[in-house]
C-alpha cells in the first residue's frame, strides 16, 4: 500500500511542478489538491506502517 501511495505522490508532485510553473496554468488547482491528498495518504500509510511494526514491501 505504501508503494502505491509513493507512486501517486510522485505523480502529484510532477503535476504540481507543471501547474506551479505555468506550463499548465489551468490545472494548477487540480495539482494542488492532488498534492495535498496524496501527502495526507502518504503520512497515514507511514503512520500505519510504524504502528504495525512491519517493513514496507518495495
Swiss-Prot record:
Q: Which UniProt keywords apply?
A: Cell membrane, Membrane, Transmembrane, Transmembrane helix
Segments crossing the lipid bilayer: 3-23, 30-50
Cellular compartments annotated: Cell membrane
Sorted alphabetically, which Pfam families does this protein's record hold? DUF1328 (PF07043)
Coiled coil residues, start to end: none
Q: Does the keyword Metal-binding apply?
A: no
The membrane-topology field of this record reads: Multi-pass membrane protein
Q: Which Gene Ontology CC terms are recorded?
A: plasma membrane
Stored InterPro entries: DUF1328
Q: Does the keyword Transmembrane helix apply?
A: yes
| Main location, first listed in the record | membrane
Q: Which NCBIfam families match?
A: PRK13682.1-1, PRK13682.1-3, PRK13682.1-4
Family that this chain belongs to: Belongs to the UPF0391 family.
Please report the name of this protein according to its UniProt entry: UPF0391 membrane protein COXBURSA331_A2131
Q: What are the leading ranks of the lineage? A: Bacteria, Pseudomonadati, Pseudomonadota, Gammaproteobacteria, Legionellales
Amino acid at each position: 500500500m505504501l508503494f502505491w501511495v509513493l507512486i501517486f505522490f510522485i505523480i502529484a508532485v510532477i503535476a504540481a511542478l507543471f501547474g506551479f510553473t505555468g506550463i499548465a496554468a489551468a490545472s494548477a488547482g487540480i495539482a494542488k489538491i492532488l498534492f495535498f491528498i496524496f501527502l495526507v495518504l502518504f503520512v497515514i500509510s507511514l503512520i500505519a506502517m510504524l504502528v504495525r511494526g512491519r517493513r514496507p514491501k518495495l
